[in-house]
Swiss-Prot record:
This is D-erythrose-4-phosphate dehydrogenase. It comes from Shigella dysenteriae serotype 1 (strain Sd197). Catalyzes the NAD-dependent conversion of D-erythrose 4-phosphate to 4-phosphoerythronate. It catalyses: D-erythrose 4-phosphate + NAD(+) + H2O = 4-phospho-D-erythronate + NADH + 2 H(+). The record marks 182 as: Activates thiol group during catalysis. Homotetramer. Pathway: Cofactor biosynthesis; pyridoxine 5'-phosphate biosynthesis; pyridoxine 5'-phosphate from D-erythrose 4-phosphate: step 1/5. The gene is epd.
Length: 339
């Protein structure tokens, strides 16, 4: 069975989902039947073809009237502001990938369902009353056929949750802190300009900028036992893609740095293959651009202090890795729903 997908919002994640679908060779499993985006279709086609972070798309892209063509595949283009007015029923949409970054409540999900979609997957953290929040590779096996409105969490949650799980299962985490070193994003300014967050009034290319983050809440959503025992801070840095996460945890069992690295390396080669990767090469952030893994552990940066404090550095392409997980979760939702 081929899953019929519609994309709502054709920004960074929406476009990368389409590119990842074609580059990964999964078109027999997923077909994009429609894209809803307020921007004009010519601009959509141009930005799909030419991307500053990920280069030229290898597939031919063209726009004709209300259709976007990728190769010979025709995708209907919509410019609808009202979720209730979207023609998902007419198009036979199985799963809507809502990549707007704006919608994330159950009410918004129900609007897609009312328009005729069978399932909804948000590309960002949603409200607590959604049917499920998935970090693929960790808890997708908990998806049920009755789960209609699902969140794929965030890029940073997808990056750090697998590593936390591995360390907790092996050594028993007592508490932890996370620092996200994230590339600049569209909600920042090119030059100094007004913004409700005064730090985000400043030019993104000229400063390291502290930003509020809800990553600690995202961690405790998956690990309730860590409530009030994990804290997170975030900074944005003057790069356009790839994120690093500095994770520090105190653990119950004594451990050495080489043992931590061996654990994570074996996981990357085994149970978490394709989700977690491991490297000891002297790499920098740009080397992880276009990497499809959720997390890449940098073994050269692992430290252990006093046998119970572990520090690790984990990289991710916050666009490409997450876009690939959107496809994985879509297929997981369809598998349990339509088998």
């Amino acid at each position: 069975m081929t899953v019929r997908v519609a994309i709502n919002g054709f920004g960074r994640i929406g476009r990368n989902v389409v590119r990842a679908l074609y580059e990964s060779g999964r078109r027999a499993e997923i077909t994009v039947v429609a894209i809803n985006e307020l921007a004009d279709a010519a601009g959509m086609a141009h930005l799909l073809k030419y991307d500053t972070s990920h280069g030229r798309f290898a597939w031919e892209v063209r726009q004709e009237r209300d259709q976007l063509f990728v190769g010979d595949d025709a995708i209907r283009v919509l410019h609808e502001r009202s979720l209730q007015s979207l023609p998902w029923r007419e198009l036979g949409v199985d799963v809507v990938l809502d990549c707007t970054g704006v919608y994330g409540s159950r009410e918004h999900g129900e609007a897609h369902i009312a328009a005729g979609a069978k399932k909804v997957l948000f590309s960002h953290p949603g409200s607590n009353d959604l049917d499920a929040t998935v970090v693929y590779g960790v808890n997708q096996d908990q998806l049920r056929a009755e789960h209609r409105i699902v969140s794929n969490a965030s890029c940073t949650t997808n990056c750090i949750i697998p590593v936390i799980k591995l360390l907790d299962d092996a050594y028993g985490i007592e508490s932890g802190t996370v620092t996200t070193i994230h590339s600049a994003m569209h909600d920042q300014q090119v030059i100094d300009a007004y913004h409700p967050d005064l730090r985000r009034t400043r030019a993104a290319s000229q400063s390291i900028i502290p930003i509020d983050t809800k990553l600690a809440a995202g961690i405790t959503r998956f690990f309730p036992q860590f409530n009030d025992r994990f804290e997170a801070i975030a900074v944005r840095v003057p790069t356009i893609n790839v994120t690093a996460i500095d994770l520090s945890v105190t653990v119950k069992k004594p451990v050495k740095a080489n043992e931590v690295n061996l654990l994570l390396q074996k996981a990357a080669q085994g149970a978490f293959h394709g989700i977690v990767d491991y490297t000891e090469l002297p790499l920098v952030s740009v080397d992880f651009n276009h990497d499809p893994h959720s997390a890449i552990v940098d073994g050269t940066q692992t430290r252990v202090s006093g046998a119970h404090l572990i520090k690790t550095l984990v990289w991710c392409d916050n666009e490409w890795g997450f876009a690939n997980r959107m496809l994985d979760t879509t297929l997981a939702m369809a598998t349990v729903a339509f088998r």
